[in-house]
Structures are given as C-alpha cells and as structure tokens.
Regions:
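Alpha-solenoid HEAT/Armadillo-like helical repeat scaffolds in large eukaryotic proteins
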Residues: 6-9, 34-42, 69-80, 106-117, ...
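Structural signature of alpha-helical solenoid repeat scaffolds
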Residues: 55-58, 93-94, 130-131, 167-168
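Helix-adjacent hinge/juxtasegments
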Residues: 63-104
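Alpha-solenoid HEAT/ARM repeat scaffold
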Residues: 15-19, 47-51, 67, 85-89, ...
C-alpha cells in the first residue's frame, strides 16, 4: 500500500492510519521526498496524520530519521491547522539534539506560538523550545533569557514547568 492509498482508505481511522504511515516510513517504502511530493495534494487533516506518524517515529526512536524530515516539519509550525502546528513543534523538539545546527529557523515561529491563546499550541512550543535550550549551542544563547521571560509570564503550570526544568538543565551548561 502506498501513502495515497493509506490517506484515501476510509476504513483506516486515526491510530490505524498513523500506524500504517509509520510502517511505510520505517520499512523504507515511504521517504521524505515522497511525502514532500504529495504534500500539496492532501488536506490539513491528512498532513496532520503524516506529521503525527513522523513525530511518533522521532519520539520513540523507531527509525533514524534524516534531517530532511526535520526541515520538512519546520514550516508547519506556522500552519493554520493546530494539529499540524502541534506535531511539527514536537518533531522539532524530538530532533533538536540530533540536528542542533538545523533548527535555527524553527525558533522564531516557536517563540510566536509560545504566546498563542491555545494551550495545546503553547505546550507544543514549550516542548520544542525546552529541548532546544538544553543543546550546547543554544544554552549559552539569548534564547535562554527569552525563555526565562516566557516562563515567568506563563500562567499554565504544566507549560511553565517544561520551561523551568529545561532552563535548570541549560543553566548547568552555562556555568
């Protein structure tokens, strides 16, 4: 089964569709170039399913994903679709330590999302930014002060705690 068949299969719902996409990627039957090629042919909900599959692979280490997946996900941080924004942010967070030199362009939209009125979008931004700040490259940067300010203003404890834990970790690198 190819990605278009999976996307158009009405019998596959939610987690089964994600599992089918994961299997295609992990088995080598679907690569990032093929995903990029169909990205203009599918709707936001379908793209969110693909991003969700990539996020699960990157989170659980099911397969070694190339930096191309990271670069593919970054523009979706600014998507109109909140599911795409959330999953793209999580992909960046999951892959930040692996590709710290390739996440620069993700930081600005993540900072924008950190002040979004939606809790899920702010949480996803905090997830990614908290993993970025713990990399050697960013622990010593001005991002540290920005995240300190954001954490001081954040009212949601779960989101604030993500920042505080990461800032504590990053402060050890700063010494």
């Amino acid at each position: 089964m190819d990605i278009i068949s999976v996307m158009n299969d009405k019998a596959l719902k939610g987690t089964k569709k994600r599992a089918a996409i994961i299997e295609l990627i992990v088995s080598g039957n679907l690569n990032c170039e093929q995903i990029e090629a169909i990205s203009t042919e599918i709707n936001d909900k379908q793209m969110a399913s693909i991003l969700e599959a990539i996020e699960e692979i990157s989170n659980k280490g099911l397969s070694q994903l190339s930096s191309r997946y990271l670069l593919f996900a970054i523009p979706y941080i600014k998507s109109e679709n909140n599911n795409c924004r959330r999953e793209a942010s999580r992909i960046v967070g999951n892959m930040a330590a692996q590709y710290p030199d390739m996440i620069e362009e993700a930081i600005s939209p993540l900072l924008d999302n950190s002040s979004n009125e939606g809790t899920i979008i702010r949480w996803a931004a905090a997830y990614a930014l908290s993993r970025i700040i713990t990399t050697d490259r960013y622990a010593q940067s001005e991002l540290y002060d920005k995240l300190t300010d954001i954490s001081n203003k954040e009212e949601d404890n779960a989101i604030r705690n993500q920042y505080l834990k990461a800032l504590k970790k990053a402060s050890k690198v700063r010494k």
